[in-house]
Amino acid sequence: MAELMTWTNEPIERLPQFSPYLTNFNGLVKREGGPANAFPDAMRCIDLDAYEKGLKKGIHNPTVDAVIGVSSGKSAELALIELRLNYKNADNLSPTKLEEKVSCSKDILSGCGKLHLIVYFVFNKQV
């Protein structure tokens, strides 16, 4: 039987290099075209796109939208989340570009803690 996982802010709040980029997860979901208040108000995330843009001017490496903390009770991990809520057609999705986002995000998070094995891609119902 699979272990029940839940969100936790602990693993993202202990990373000082990302503290300027911590944001409310509901706010990020809404900015990406999702519903308001779908998650608990206390749930925070690292806005990895904002982090990458704040790091350097000009060309930015592609990253997933958010990093959240998850826990099964034993240990906390960092989970990568890509929100594709504005997409209307699956043909507009590029597996290569999505893989690049994951790869660049993992590079940024290298040494920051254990990464959850599953990367979550969230789409709207039409895709």
Q: Where are the regions a protein language model picked out?
A:
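Conserved catalytic cores of phosphodiester-cleaving nucleases, focusing on short active-site segments
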Residues: A66-I68, E77-N86, S105
